[in-house]
Design a protein with these regions (language model features):
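Short coil/turn connectors at secondary-structure junctions
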Residues: 33-36, 60-64, 103-104, 110-114, ...
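Glycine-rich loop/linker segments at domain edges
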Residues: 8, 13-20, 89-97, 161-204, ...
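Short helix/loop capping segments that flank catalytic or ligand/cofactor-binding pockets
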Residues: 28-29, 48-50, 76-77, 125-128, ...
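Acidic, glycine-rich active-site loops and adjacent beta-strand->loop/helix elements
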Residues: 72, 220-223, 247-251, 280-290, ...
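Flexible, low-hydrophobicity surface segments
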Residues: 1-162, 184, 271
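Glycine-rich and small/hydrophobic secondary-structure elements
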Residues: 83-124, 253-305, 361-384
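Alpha-helical support elements that line or immediately flank enzyme active sites
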Residues: 39-70, 116-135, 204-272, 329-339, ...
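Beta-strand segments within the central parallel beta-sheet cores of soluble alpha/beta enzyme folds
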Residues: 69, 239-246, 273-283, 310-315, ...
Length: 384
């Protein structure tokens, strides 16, 4: 290949189709006999399910099935697969949190799915959901702040709400460098929790293909990761599961995980031997999509008389939500980004992940790099 061709800009072939309303999203790919699913979700952030009766809803017009945690347990898919969460640098296991596909007892955040209602139409499913008799006992205290270590425990039986922690670098060397510095600059940071607002809300279609394989069609940006996790969840060889990601109407990180709804529609399709489709509405997305950021802490930068960096210490606390996942450790993966493009002889950090009664957090737009870059650049601004 000659140099001229190598440096020529590549044409964009997808744009005309997308801007001409010819995109093919998950909702455009439904088979004619697809069933529609909706979820009864917890209206409280912390408490217990006191009573649940689905008898009246089960006999409603158009209803095919109403699935609960008991059904999931019966089929051996009660909990999400928990892999690759943050580690502790003292060698101890992280505080493991089992995330149920459908909740049967303890509510840990607003919007946890309790029942899956499946019907011939979405309207029929929504009408049936109104007939479900459910009562909750809400707790008066809710763990919303990572600052309150002695607050109500998200996971009773634990010593505190620390999910995991990790230390990087050699702190004594940084302490010595800061003690000798001509100037030290401290920056207390608080990076707010955010959520996404994509054009296409999350949607998922579970089905059985012509070869008898389980199939998930979903608006996801990481189909290969989802493929492996589904295989573990259903205890199947990877060649018995397919994940198809058609055109995705926005994500920026939020659609990078295997969500409970993805697993649930595949399980329902397997159980009913019929395609099952679910799509969130805007309000549902707000409480069921993974959140991001939610990092606070302190950073200290040492400088010599000439303004050269001598040492950097970063202590960061991350709100991980009620459950850990493989994507929780975004801040850990890229905490090295605090070094930036600058020469700093010694750097150390302490990262602590806290449980709260909120939706779990995951990385948006950079997997921890934006937070790390913000910290060092604001420190330099203050030093200047």
């Amino acid at each position: 290949m000659n140099g001229e061709k190598l440096l020529s800009p590549a044409g964009r072939c997808a744009d005309p189709r997308l801007v001409a309303r010819a995109a093919r999203h998950t909702a455009d790919l439904l088979p004619g006999d697809a069933l529609h699913a909706v979820f009864l979700r917890s209206p409280i952030a912390r408490g217990r399910i006191r009573h649940l009766s689905i008898d009246a809803a089960r006999s409603a017009a158009g209803v095919t099935a109403i699935l609960t945690a008991d059904d999931a347990a019966q089929d051996g898919v009660e909990y999400m697969v928990w892999t690759g969460a943050p580690v502790r640098d003292d060698g101890a296991a992280s505080s493991e949190s089992q995330r149920p596909l459908l909740n049967r007892a303890v509510i840990r955040h607003l919007g946890e799915p309790v029942c899956m209602i499946i019907a011939k139409t979405q309207k029929a499913a929504l009408d049936a959901m109104e007939l479900i008799d459910v009562a909750y006992d809400a707790d008066d205290e809710i763990a919303l702040s990572i600052d309150d270590l002695q607050g109500p425990l998200v996971w009773p039986g634990s010593a505190d709400n620390i999910a995991a922690f990790h230390r990087l670098g050699y702190k004594p060397a940084v302490d010595a460098a800061l003690a000798k510095a001509a100037q030290t600059v401290r920056f207390d940071f608080d990076i707010s929790k955010v959520t996404a607002c994509t054009i296409e809300m999350r949607s998922a279609l579970g089905s059985i293909d012509a070869n008898g394989k389980l199939c998930l069609t979903t608006s996801a940006q990481s189909p290969f990761a989802l493929h492996g996790e589904l295989a573990k969840l259903f205890d199947l060889p990877t060649d018995q599961i397919r994940v198809i990601a058609p055109d995705v109407g926005g994500s920026f990180g939020m659609k990078g995980a295997l969500y409970r709804e993805d697993a649930l529609v595949v399980w329902a399709a397997k159980r009913l031997q019929q395609a099952v489709f679910w799509s969130a509405d805007r309000s549902e997305s707000f409480i069921s999509d993974e959140h991001a950021r939610a990092v606070c802490g302190t950073a200290v930068l040492g400088l010599d008389a000439d303004g050269l960096f001598t040492g950097l210490w970063v202590e960061a606390n991350t709100d991980t939500g009620a459950y850990l996942s493989r994507r929780t450790k975004g801040m850990l993966n890229n905490i090295g980004g605090v070094a930036g493009q600058y020469k700093t002889p010694v750097i150390a950090s302490a990262l602590t992940f806290f449980y709260t009664n909120t939706m779990q957090t995951s990385p948006y737009r950079g997997f921890g790099r934006p937070e790390a870059t913000y910290i060092i650049e604001r420190l330099i601004d203050k030093a200047a």
